[in-house]
Regions:
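Conserved alpha/beta-domain cores
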Residues: 1-171
């Protein structure tokens, strides 16, 4: 796979001309080779998403040193036994979805408080997807912020594949 500069420029232009509020592009680089990530960096992309701790470490440990303005998001499910390792490489966690995971992050509070978190909501209520159910979302966000001091900055919601997304965007 290679980085598609033309596609990126078209998306950036569309956002610039149509967005009513600031929009940040997160380039999901999972399964992409390092050469594609370097091409993306050379085009100005600085926010990347990865769904595996080991793969992200292999690609970004050196890149983040040479490009300190790079921000790395965890976009896939996180096992509690990988929390400590993930804190070394990721800046933003988009998949906070259960109390056990929150408690594991709290073991490393000095590092956790410098990170950003999104609560993952399973808006399609799909059994095979991660995330908490929509009706539990507010209570879980309050637990994270008020009870645990986790810096939650938003929600990460993905509508089900092969369905019209608009009904799910009401959440």
């Amino acid at each position: 796979m290679t980085f598609n500069k033309k596609n990126y420029e078209e998306i950036s232009s569309f956002i610039k001309n149509n967005a009513q509020k600031p929009v940040k592009i997160v380039a999901v680089s999972k399964n992409h080779p390092l050469s594609s990530i370097i091409d993306a960096l050379n085009c100005g992309i600085r926010i990347f998403g990865e769904n595996r701790v080991q793969e992200a470490r292999g690609k970004f440990q050196d890149l983040k040193s040479s490009h300190p303005d790079t921000e790395l998001h965890l976009t896939g499910p996180l096992q509690t036994n990988k929390v400590k390792a993930s804190l070394d490489i990721f800046d933003v966690f988009q998949t906070l979805d259960r109390e056990k995971l929150v408690r594991e992050f709290l073991k490393y509070q000095n590092i956790t408080k410098r990170k950003k978190f999104f609560v993952q909501i399973n808006i399609g209520k799909e059994k095979n997807k991660s995330g908490i159910m929509p009706e539990e979302g507010l209570e879980f966000v309050n637990y994270c912020i008020n009870d645990c001091g986790i810096p939650v900055i938003g929600l990460m919601c993905i509508p089900p594949q092969h369905k019209t997304p608009s009904p799910f965007l009401l959440y």
